[in-house]
Each structure stands twice: as structure tokens, then as C-alpha cells.
Amino acid sequence: MVTAKCRPVALFKEYLEKGYYPFLLEGEGEYYTRIEQMINYIIETELPQICKVDVSNIRKIQALIKLVCDEVPFELNANKIASAFEIGRDTVVEYLKYLGDARVLNLLYSDKKKVGKLAKPDKVYMENPNLLYALSPGKVDIGTARESFAVSSLSESHTVEYGKAQGDFKVDGKYTFEIGGRGKDYSKIAGIPDSYIFADDWDIPDGSKLPLWMLGFLY
């Protein structure tokens, strides 16, 4: 049993901040700097070369990423962002999709089967919580970090949709997941079949309440 061999809750808290990328093994001191360099390379080099992004919009893409990091929760208003950044609404959606393909962001839709080419996502997360801590130091909302981890882990081999009124996420069109801390109760998912709570301050499964760190075993 995992809990007999280590302290998963304590280790999980460390992992949310540092642990996603293997270059952590080269030393913790430069870990966040390496992440920033990686993101800048994607934005400044790969997007213009591969996706033909206008280099004059690079700073706007950087600002868009910063917005995703800082807003809690980040539910997309593409028209508002387009107006603020002085670019087209479709361009905003296009850039988000590029960043999703580059594994900088995870884009969630309330109904993935009906997503069109220029459909805006309902909710946007950084691809993993380490990006939050690297790009928005001192401002990370723990709820956002939890959800970012959950989406990142589940998306490897499952379909994840924005839950809207029923839970945080709908998984594979069947399961309803609510993400939270130790005190999270069943009020938002009461009476919903195949619904579960994943809590980060939780050691072992208790009925339909499961440790959030267990999702890390999915990949």
C-alpha cells in the first residue's frame, strides 16, 4: 500500500509546485527558470515557425497566458479578450488552440462532441500546476492548481469535459468528478450517478471520496 511506504499527501503538495518536468532532476534552483525558457521558446520560436503566428502578437499571447494563470477561475470570454488585446475573436480562439496543441494549456468544452473548428472553450487551464507556480509566483490559487492537475492527469487517456452545473468535470461522458480539499462535501454532486470527490488532503479512499493524488497513476 502506497501510504505505508511514503507520505503521499505531503509529497503531492510538493509535486503540484515542482515535479512535472524531468529536468527537476538536474536541480531545483533553476527549475522555474527552465520552465519560463521553455514557454518563451514555444511562443517566440515554435508558434511563428510552425503555426505562422504573427510575431507582432507574441506579447499578446504572453499576456493571454498570464491572464489564464492569474484569473480564478478562468472561464473564457473571447470577445472581451479580443477587445482588450485588439485582435479578432477568432484569432483568440485560434491562439488558444495552438497553445493547447503545444501542451501549454488544456481547453475544456461542455460538450466535446459538438466542438467546431472555431468554437471557444468553456474553461481554460494551464497544462499542469507547475506552470502556474513558475509563471505566477505567489499568486497561485490552490483550487486552480488542484483542477489543473486533475485535468492534466485525466486527459492523458480520457475525455474530460467542463461539468457546468454538475460537478467540476464530466469524464468519458459518464463520470462526474468534483475536485477540492479535505472538507469538500457531496452537496454539488448529490444524487448524481457515478459521481466522485477527489480531495488533495486525503490519504485513502472513503466511499466515493478519493485522494486526488491517485489520479497521478493514470499516466
Model-flagged regions — what are they?
Residues 1-133:
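Interdomain hinge/linker elements that couple catalytic modules in large macromolecular machines
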Residues 97, 103-219:
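A cross-kingdom feature that marks ATP-driven nucleic-acid transaction machinery
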